[in-house]
Amino acid sequence: MRPDGRKPTQLRPVKIIRDFNIYAEGSVLIEMGNTKVIITASIEEKVPPFLRGTGQGWITAEYAMLPRSTESRSIREVVRGAPSGRTQEIQRLIGRSLRGVVDLKKLGERTLWVDCDVIQADGGTRVASITGAFIAVADAMIKLTESGKVRQNPLKDYVAAISTGIVGNEVVLDLNFKEDSSAKVDMNLVMTGSGNFVEVQATGEEYSFTQQEFDKMLEYGKLGINKLIHIQKKFIEGMPSIGHWKRLSIKEFSYTDTGGN
């Protein structure tokens, strides 16, 4: 039995509130269980020096945790003087995941900044950031297209992420902090709406896992991502094959998983 009584393939309750920030081109508050992340997408009309004159844009992500997002207060990284290795790893993961579904040439010479601020952490902050960030980025891309600054929406596909792992002797989906802390194996999976992989991170903790266990984690992860993309489609209507993307009118959506397909 899992600490919160969920089935092995059951997501925590998911809630997304759109336009959480009144200034950003795109913003959401995403909740996955007790994990809560605010995400904003901001467009800047310039690119990093290495892209100047190329006609290509860039997407970069920043990630931070509020001091009391965890059980005990942590020191702000700006006070420490530099982001930790963990923070840098997560920022790169979020950026890679979003660049995987955006045509940077169509974006033109502009930068999309994605800021992910964890206000409460209970496991899965990086995957919640990616899943929520897609909606914020999509809203920003739709606004950019409707303004006439780009000819065609740069979005290529949906993208979402989820954690899975082995806790005790059982493969489970969407680990909370207690499960993550005791997991033998932890996997983070990032996939597109068309079923392609952007990233697979799987690590054993004093444990080596079998091909069969890996396949089962992958199966559970794909199941979870399909559910999350279904939620994204409540906010964004997309037909990637013809480059059609539309912002739907819904502002808030809550989803309770029953653990089925």
Curated annotation (Swiss-Prot):
InterPro entries: ExoRNase_PH_dom1, ExoRNase_PH_dom2, ExoRNase_PH_dom2_sf, PNPase/RNase_PH_dom_sf, Ribosomal_Su5_D2-typ_SF, RNase_PH, RNase_PH_bac-type, RNase_PH_CS. One of its GO terms (biological process) is rRNA catabolic process. The keyword rRNA processing applies. Its EC number is 2.7.7.56. It catalyses: tRNA(n+1) + phosphate = tRNA(n) + a ribonucleoside 5'-diphosphate. The keyword Transferase applies. GO terms for molecular function: 3'-5'-RNA exonuclease activity; tRNA binding; tRNA nucleotidyltransferase activity. PROSITE patterns: RIBONUCLEASE_PH. It is an enzyme of class 2 (transferase). Keywords: Nucleotidyltransferase, RNA-binding, rRNA processing, Transferase, tRNA processing, tRNA-binding. Signal peptide: none annotated. Phosphate binds at residues 86, 124-126. Transmembrane segments: none annotated. Pfam families: RNase_PH (PF01138), RNase_PH_C (PF03725). Phosphorolytic 3'-5' exoribonuclease that plays an important role in tRNA 3'-end maturation. Removes nucleotide residues following the 3'-CCA terminus of tRNAs; can also add nucleotides to the ends of RNA molecules by using nucleoside diphosphates as substrates, but this may not be physiologically important. Probably plays a role in initiation of 16S rRNA degradation (leading to ribosome degradation) during starvation. Homohexameric ring arranged as a trimer of dimers. Belongs to the RNase PH family. PANTHER family: EXOSOME COMPLEX COMPONENT, EXOSOME COMPLEX COMPONENT RRP41. This is Ribonuclease PH. The gene is rph.
